[in-house]
Every structure is written in structure tokens, then in C-alpha cells.
Amino acid sequence: MQLICRTLEAAGAPPAPAASYNSPVTIASDLERARRLIFAADEEAAKQLLLSLDEQIEKADRDDLLLEVYAQLGEIYLVRTAYNGVEECLGRITDCLTIYQSIRAGTNPEAAAKSTMSDADVDHMICRYSRRAQFLRTGLAAAAHGDHEAAEAGLLVLTGDTSTAFPDLAAEHRFVVTYARILCASALCDDDLHVRSVPLWRHVLKAIETSCGDSEFDDFLLVQAGTGYGRFCVETGRLSEAEPWLQRAGARAMKHGWKLATARTQFERSTARWSAGDRAECQRLVHEAYSAIAEGYRAHDVSRCWLYFGLLSLSIEMLDDADERFGHAERHWREVEKPLHIHRILLQRSWVDIFRGDFAAAKERTNEARMLLDSWPRRSWLQSARLDDHLGSILRAEALADPDNAAAKFEQAAELKVPAALAVDSVRHSMTDADARMRWANHVSARILAGAFAVAWEWGNTELVSELIEYHSARGSFSTEPDAQAADWTETATAAVPLDTVDEYALVAAGSAVSTGAALTRLGPLPPLRMDPTKGPIMSRYRALAFERYGCAVTADEPAWSTWP
């Protein structure tokens, strides 16, 4: 007797023809086939198969099988970003479980009279599908709403369910916990919250390495984890660590013939090649991957492909082609409402405007990007500093294009670039670990500091140039930075987010200096620097702006250092 019998059309799915059989064994076999189709990312075929079982399951009077249909459909809608469908499936699972829980509590005698399941079977079903519902609830909070706190709470409920009453559900529970962690970690990375994802990735990798690895479920998790963690490594500047995971995930996906999963690993490898400066290999990989990604209806990944297509066009100065490709990326990100990514692609598209000499259009895009960033509740000071530095680059380009009226533009550019440079550099020198300092220099501070020097030099402001040199000399670190820097436009939308970051280090930067023995680099903020006994400390206004805008106190509360002979 079905206790839930609503049709699935409300979830946005068309009715499907019913199968001509209703054997529970055959239905269970079809559910397993649907699961394999989901693993292969053939969601349309899986959905049609699942929908075709609805009437037959109703005739078989098996609510447990119907719950499995809802659970699998919910997963399909989740990965396809059809979040209304996820909510519909989640609601149906919850409604059904509520009825059976009331039966077991003895508070619903009418429903109890209709139920044909034993108490043990009811308890088994409640345990199994409460977990599956919690998985959908957690994934929905992370992926659809970016509500990482709710996702974390949901994950705690899922991991805290340590019941051993049904040993046959233990493997499935491990699967949904690990899969939920992958989804939550990936969602954090989408929002530039890579630091918060680290504990999740640690749990995921441990689960992968300790699994038996002898089932399709294990292989699916390995592919999802390897792809997600590989992307995490690329985005945090750990390219050497990314490649083995992406290769391993790609090989396992290829073994099963999972075309979309294979393509996604290829695409992540292409992003690593771009970061390493290997444009030819990046182009080969992204073009090979795009077809399967587009056919898989992954709007976010499609947008990322178009971003790299645009970057490749921009690298050979095909401005119209680059702008068109960036436009495709922006359109797809707007469709899935990704404000942080829309802000990035607007900044990237503004480089096309800069190269065309259309500085008004570049500023307009940048101002729209700022509005999106300001409305983003999880924005970081580093994102704001990078945006200010970018606007300074527009003003610098405008000044270079109009030498007769350049002074005012250079001054405005310096007002943006120098405080941003001081802020990110102060964070670099708050790090006691030398490798962390070098990663921060490679991916954040070196380029921004170089831009500040360039503006001061091109402005002809010898006083500011001297002060920047004095500041850098006081750090004792002229020889510790990489020699070559990529052009500004190459990293606007793809800049790495080092784990040695963000708000925590803004606070550390304001702390006391760290003694490092005989080291040439002073850790922590510098005290005020005075180059001339008749004048005040250098760059005082720029340091004040750095604190006002980003919360980075770049000056230690100590007596001033005198740098004259």
C-alpha cells in the first residue's frame, strides 16, 4: 500500500513510459543500472529509467524502492544544478519518512493499518533514507546556496550518525559521507574559501587511501576526489601535487568509460598547464575536454572552459575572439548565479577593453565587479586588494596612452596600487615558514608590488620610487623573489589563492615582529622608516590607506628606524 504516490512531474521531469513488469527483483536491478548511469554521468538516461519505474513500484507496494528513486533523482538534480528538483525529491523523502516514523512511534494508527512492512524493515528504511536525505540536504546547502555553515552542520549530522544497527548499510554510509565531504570542499573552493576546505580534503583523501577500491562506488569516489583535490591544488599553487591526483582520477575514469569524468580531469590538467605557462599543452587539453563537458550540461565547468578559451585567444592578441569567449563564460555564470565568478570574468574582460584603449568600458566592468564583490558576504580583503590593484592598472594604462595628461592618472593609480602592495607584502612577512612566504610571493605579492614600482617609476615620482626601494631594502629581500613575472592579464580570473592566507594573516601582520636570528628578512610589520631627519616617516599615507581599506596594519608600533647614514 503506497503511503506516498505523488507524480514526479513537479520536479521538472516529463512523464516516462511505464515498464511492462513489476517484479521487485527486476526493479532493484533497474535501480542498480540507474546508479551505473549516474556514475557515467548519463543523467538523462538514468532519469528516464528511474521515472519509468514509478508506476511499477506503486503496484509492487514498495515505498523503500520509491525512496531509492527519489534519492537517486535528487543526486541527478544536484549535479545538474537543478536545485528545485533536489528540493522536491528531498521533500518527498522527508514526507514519507515522517509517516513511517509516526507509525513506529505509535501516533499514526491509520497509516499503520495500511503498512505491510515489518518493524525491522521500517527501521532499516528509516535509517537508510534519513542518511540519504541528509546527504541531499548538505549538498544543497553547499552547492545551491553557498551556505557553508549550514552545510557544515548537515555534515556533522551525517558523520555523527554512528548507528551500527544495520551493518549492511555501513558501506553506503561511508560512501555518502565521503561524497558529501567532496561536495562541501568543492563548494568552499568555489567561494575562494580554500583554507576552510583543508580538513575536509584531509578526511576525503584518508577515506580514498583506506578504501578497498574493489567496487564501482570506490572508483567513483576516487575520480570525484582526485578531480576536486587536483583542482584545489592548482588553485592554491601546488601544481606538482595536483598532477598525480588528476592523472590517477583520469586513468580510473577512462577504465570505466566515464567520458565526462575523464574530460574533467583533462580540463583541470589544462588549468595547471596554464598556471605553469605551457600555453600549447593547455590549449590541447582544454579543446579535447570541452566537447564532453558541454554535452554533460555542467554550466560551471562550461564557463571555466570558455574562460580558458578566451585567455588563449588573448595570449595571441585575438581581442574580438577573446571577448566573445569571455562573453560566453559570463553568460553561463550568470545563468547559474555565481556572483564571485561573474566578478572575476568582468575583470578579465576589462583587459580586452584596456588593450583596445576603451578605458571607460574597462572602468565600467570593474565598477560592476566591485558591486558584485561588495554584495558578496564572504568576500576577503585579498579579493578587494586585487580589485583595487586592477583598477590601478587601468588608470596606469590610461596614463600611458595620454602622456600629456598622465600625471593625475598615475597619481590615482598609485593611490590604489601602493596600499594594496603594502598590504599583501605585510602579510607575506607575517609568515614564519619560508616556503609559505615564497608561495605568497609567487602567487600574490610579487606581481602587485612590481606594479606599484612601475607606476611610481612611470609617474616620474622619484621620491616614491626611493621610498619603495628603501622599504624593500629594509625587508632585506631584494634577492629572494622570483625574477620573472607573468603579465597582469594572465592571472586576473585565475589567480591562485594560497592556503597561507587571508584574514588570519591580516591580523598577524599587525602583531609584533618575529626574531629570526641572523636572517636578513625581518618578519612582521616594519616600524616607521625615516629617510630624512627633516621629514616624517615614509609612505605614511599609503600605509594608513592599507589599514583603512584592508585591515592590514603594515606599521609596527615601535620607534622609527632611521635609514640615513
For each of these PLM feature ranges, what is it?
Residues 51-58, 91-104, 156-168, 202-214, ...:
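Amphipathic alpha-helical segments of tetratricopeptide repeats
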Residues 22-23, 41-42, 61-62, 120, ...:
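Short coil/turn linker motifs that delimit alpha-helical repeat modules in TPR/alpha-solenoid proteins
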